[in-house]
Structures are given as structure tokens and as C-alpha cells.
């Protein structure tokens, strides 16, 4: 599977952490500039960690398996290393991993049959609201269930090679299909629950990968999922990826945002 090597461990040279996911874009293309203005890059002490999504000027949603003790975010970026006119940097004042996510799984170096990575989402409260511009925009939470067969778009700066070792400087987009959860039940030894979405290409070649965790899954123009976990190597035939199903969590998200203005 996304061999449980937490992207944090990869980027910082640590070997004591291992997340359930390996999020990256394989088989994608360079996103058009400013086409994903809600895309966020989450950093840990200056090192790229995970993707995220701007759902409110003061709030970013990402994956709970990206949890650590220090965050900053970049908004409005296409290339992670070039000066860009729409880029905005923000510190994070508070983080709220979903209480139902089993953080102990992150520190396991091997994934076991039956491991359950449900509730893989986290809210980040920005210390200063984002300035909404042509290059930085919020995207609404879903209000209805996504339909199997929908065309979806995932994006991120994760690995562009199946082995997860070559990250992208430029934001990558990939078009994948929303599949029935039964397809992922057949594909993976870990638990696939109704709190997850299954998306990918059954023929392989297109997938998210290491480093894409926490980024958006947009189906028919609606934010429906957050990149969570998948098979390692990425993009294998009959091994679609797993995404947190946001429609299941909108009450919790709204409650956290309301209680922490």
C-alpha cells in the first residue's frame, strides 16, 4: 500500500513515522495556472508535508494522518519554489484532527489486514484569514452524495513516479473516476468503510501518490473527498485510491469552525 511511510518521514529523513496513505499524482498533467485556487500546500518547519483545501478564508482541511506539531501553509501556489504573484503565506494557530481517527496507526511501520483509516481529516485554523483573489479562493463543502461514475479531479505536488520518490515542483492534476466502494474492498486488505470514497482507473496509470495526502478530490465540480491512502506502488491496475468522504463530516466541520471563530 502507500507503504505507510509518512510523507513527513520522507521529507525530514525521519524513520519513526508511517502514515496509511501514499498520496501523489501519477499519470497526471500540469494544472493550468490558478485553475485550483483552493489548493493549499501544508508545510512542517519549512518542509513540504501535505496538500490541503481552503474551505473558508480562515480554515484549511487536510488529512489527519498529516498531523504534527507545527504547520504553515502556502495558498495560491502553482510552483512550490518560484516567486508567484498570487502566493500567500499563513501560519496555523490551531489544528483539529478528527477525534475518530486512530493516530496510533501512523506510527506503525507495517500495515495490517483490517487496519481502519476512517475519519482521516483535520482542520487547520489560520492565524490570519486568506485574502480572496483570482489565485486564492475557497471551495464549498458538498451538500449531496457523489454519484458513482462521476468524473473527478485530484491535485497535488506528490510523487509523479509510482515508487513515490520523485516529487513534482508544479501542481499536478489527474482525472479519475469515482468507483463503487466494492471495487476498493476487493483491492485492499485494509478496511474500506462508508466514510471513504473509492476513485481511480481500473486499468491503472492514474492515481494520487506520496505527498498528495490532504488534497482535494473534486467530482463534477464539487469538493467531495480528501486524498487519504492507497496502494504502493501508485497507479497499479485494479488498485484505486481511497479518499475521505466529506459529506459524512460536514456537521463536525461546521461545529469546529463555529466553536473556534
Curated annotation (Swiss-Prot):
It comes from the Eukaryota. GO terms for biological process: regulation of systemic arterial blood pressure; zymogen activation. Residues 25-258 form the Peptidase S1 domain. GO terms for molecular function: serine-type endopeptidase activity. This is Kallikrein-1. It catalyses: Preferential cleavage of Arg-|-Xaa bonds in small molecule substrates. Highly selective action to release kallidin (lysyl-bradykinin) from kininogen involves hydrolysis of Met-|-Xaa or Leu-|-Xaa. InterPro entries: Peptidase_S1_PA, Peptidase_S1_PA_chymotrypsin, Peptidase_S1A, Trypsin_dom, TRYPSIN_HIS, TRYPSIN_SER. The keyword Signal applies. Glycans are attached at residue 108. Belongs to the peptidase S1 family. Kallikrein subfamily. The gene is Ngfg. Disulfide bonds join 31-173, 50-66, 152-219, 184-198, 209-234. CDD domains: Tryp_SPc (cd00190). GO terms for cellular component: extracellular space; secretory granule. The keyword Protease applies. The active site is at 65 (charge relay system), 120 (charge relay system), 213 (charge relay system). It comes from Rattus norvegicus (Rat). Residues 19-24 form a propeptide.
